[in-house]
Amino acid sequence: SESKKVFLDAGVPTPQAEILDCSNGIVMPSLPLPFVIKPPCEGSSVGVHIVRRQEDVLPAMKEAVTHGTTVLVEEFIQGKELTVGILDGKALPVIHICPRSGFYDLSNKYPWMNMGGGTDYICPADLPEETAAKVQEAALKAYKAAGVEVYGRVDVLLREEDGAPFVLEINTIPGMTPSSLLPKAAAASGWPYEDLCEKIVELSL
């Protein structure tokens, strides 16, 4: 929720949102449907619900407050899920995240946990050069607005109807296993895994 405020203040393109304080009981969202309900302090899409029908709002809110009393409600944008790794203030190639079913939730991120889902990653993303540059520009703007240094990863939605990029969130400590997304993007840019790790350590000193 703090990053959302930072994005809005800095003019970073990001979905419309409201932050609900449910410490004294559930507060119902005022955004028009469809929208996304998410606990702002969880990772890996835990507790995230895409809500399309009015009757599903209350159950989703009840589930969200089990993760904390602050709930982020965000306009739902139909489009491609992308992520941009950033190293030393420079954007790496865009990755297209392609869940095999539904959206990029826990089961699609970590299919071995429940033997379901799964996701394909296309890097560099299958985008026109101009579109990829727009996505990288939005990601860099978010990275700088949040005051991140050395490295990070920014999740972006590319709206289906007009190809406009919208920043969802920034990961200031992205996964760094050889199969994680930032190393995938770095490899596509010519950075072997060992060199990437050395560069991050060097920049951090």
Tell where the protein language model's regions lie, with residue ranges:
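Active-site nucleotide/adenylate-binding loops and adjacent lid/helix of ATP-dependent enzymes
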Residues: 1-80
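Short beta-strand-to-turn element immediately C-terminal to the catalytic PLP-Schiff-base lysine
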Residues: 20, 48-53, 86-88, 159, ...
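Glycine-rich phosphate/pyrophosphate-binding beta-alpha loops
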Residues: 45, 100-103, 171-185
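Phosphate-binding site of ATP-dependent enzymes
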Residues: 52-137, 165-166
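Conserved metal-phosphate-binding beta-hairpin within the catalytic cores
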Residues: 75, 86, 143-176, 186
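Peripheral (often C-terminal) accessory segments that flank ATP-dependent C-N-forming ligase machineries
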Residues: 120-125, 145, 149, 159-161, ...
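Amphipathic alpha-helical segments that line or abut small-molecule/effector binding pockets
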Residues: 133-140, 194-202
